[in-house]
Design a protein with these regions (language model features):
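Alpha-helical transmembrane segments and, especially, the helix-loop junctions at the ends
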Residues: 63-80, 93-138, 143-157
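Residue-level signature of transmembrane alpha-helical entry/exit and packing/kink sites
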Residues: 16-17, 52-56, 135, 139, ...
Length: 211
């Protein structure tokens, strides 16, 4: 509409941002193919199942770290079934940890050094003597503080399950399945671990070179 109706001249395509997205997707795909993402989900599952009472506080930190490392919020999908199941088993409203976990994964996009959002912002500020480290020094603590505040607020969202009539009705009607969700096993643990290490090392390298 702006081009054909109002006659505005289109700008050049954001090649840098597009190449960054391609690079991140390619690297994340390699890590997934090597089993690295499955290994990370396995670690997250162990952490959450060992600390079920702290699920509302830990789940947003887990999804935040996942997205921060990978540069995309899509990697957090794999851990959401674990969060929902652990919360239900602990008689904690699943919407509490799930809601803030999804928000945390999106907040981490603006703090991740390899996300398209951060790269786009860096390209826009390139002429103002602002480095990647300058952006991260603001975005990381701000998003982390916001996520933690949101997690504490989520502790009091909705009724307790023991007082929720809809939950009690579904329990009485045996609508809940007894099957437990388990994260996908890792066939080659060494290769999976190596892929995670390489990916994290590459992320650190981007931060150092971008500074």
């Amino acid at each position: 509409i702006l081009t054909f109706v109002f006659g505005l001249e289109p700008t050049s395509p954001p090649i840098d941002v597009m190449l960054m997205i391609v690079a991140v997707i390619a690297a994340a795909s390699c890590m997934q193919a090597a089993g690295g993402l499955d290994l990370m989900v396995k670690w997250a599952e162990k952490l959450l199942r060992k600390n079920p009472s702290k699920i509302t506080l830990l789940s947003p930190l887990v999804t935040y770290i996942f997205t921060f490392i990978a540069g995309t919020g899509h990697v957090a999908y794999s851990v959401l079934p674990v969060i929902a199941e652990v919360a239900t088993e602990t008689k904690i409203r699943p919407e509490r940890p799930l809601g803030i976990a999804v928000i945390a994964s999106q907040q981490a996009i603006t703090a991740s050094p390899i996300s398209a959002a951060t790269v786009a912002l860096l390209s826009m500020l390139s002429g103002h003597n602002i480095s990647l480290m300058d952006i991260l020094m603001i975005s990381v603590p701000c998003t982390l503080i916001g996520v933690l505040v949101g997690a504490f607020c989520s502790l009091h969202v909705g009724k307790e399950l023991a007082e929720d009539p809809e939950y009690l009705r579904r329990v009485a009607n045996e609508e809940f399945t007894s099957d437990k969700y388990r994260a996908k096993g890792v066939e080659n643990h060494h290769a999976a671990l190596l892929s995670v290490i390489i990916f994290i090392a590459a992320t650190i390298g981007i931060v150092l070179f971008g500074s």
